């Protein structure tokens, strides 16, 4: 009995050990599967990051190229517009030709000065040559002085700025070989100042018409 009992005990002990070993093996296999899955996930995430980095690098290169192109265009236009009283700036990623109201109009008026037509003719030639197919927005801007002398004509600076923008737009349509379906105007009144409006000099800077070339 003692011998048989010992054999039985050994048998069951072997089964227990085998069972434990199998369980551990199964657990290790499951851990390996999970680790493999996690490695694959990390590899996928890494590839995604590489792709995003490459896209970011391409976008940065594109932005630098666009910035250089705009700055080259700005310098070229400024050189050709010397002596006209007209300036050129980069505005929200677009070329903007800035025409002071003092160059274009007499005080409170909407009729173009004779000298203004000479300046606008030069602007026309540049737009025809450099931007024949671009959309163009003509913007009117004023200072913050309320309308007084011409109150019967213009209820507010919005109306005055819009009418002055329209005057310039009509000149472009009549004298430039530009597609009129790609030109439009906006009157901003005093609400997009470029200076403080605290004195005559800053107010003069705010009274302007801008021709914005909406390049892609």
Feature annotation, model-predicted:
Residues 23-98, 111:
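Extracellular/lumenal/periplasmic "stalk" regions immediately C-terminal to a signal peptide or transmembrane helix
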């Amino acid at each position: 009995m003692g011998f048989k009992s010992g054999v039985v005990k050994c048998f069951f002990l072997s089964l227990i050990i085998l069972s434990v070993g199998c369980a551990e093996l199964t657990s290790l296999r499951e851990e390996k599967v999970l680790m493999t899955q996690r490695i694959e996930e990390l590899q996928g995430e890494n590839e995604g990051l590489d792709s995003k980095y490459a896209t970011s690098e391409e976008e940065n290169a594109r932005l630098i190229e666009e910035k250089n192109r705009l700055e080259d265009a700005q310098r070229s236009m400024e050189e050709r517009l010397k002596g006209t009283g007209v300036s050129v700036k980069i505005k929200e990623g677009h070329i903007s030709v800035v025409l002071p109201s003092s160059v274009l109009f007499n005080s409170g008026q909407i009729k173009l000065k004779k000298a203004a037509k000479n300046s606008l003719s030069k602007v026309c030639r540049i737009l025809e040559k450099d931007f024949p197919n671009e959309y163009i927005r003509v913007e009117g801007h004023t200072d913050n002085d309320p309308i007084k002398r011409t109150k019967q004509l213009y209820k507010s600076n919005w109306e005055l700025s819009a009418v002055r923008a329209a005057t310039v737009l009509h000149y472009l349509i009549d004298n430039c070989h530009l597609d009129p379906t790609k030109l439009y105007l906006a009157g901003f009144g005093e609400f997009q100042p470029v200076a403080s409006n605290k004195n005559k000099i800053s107010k003069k800077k705010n009274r302007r018409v801008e021709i914005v070339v909406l390049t892609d």
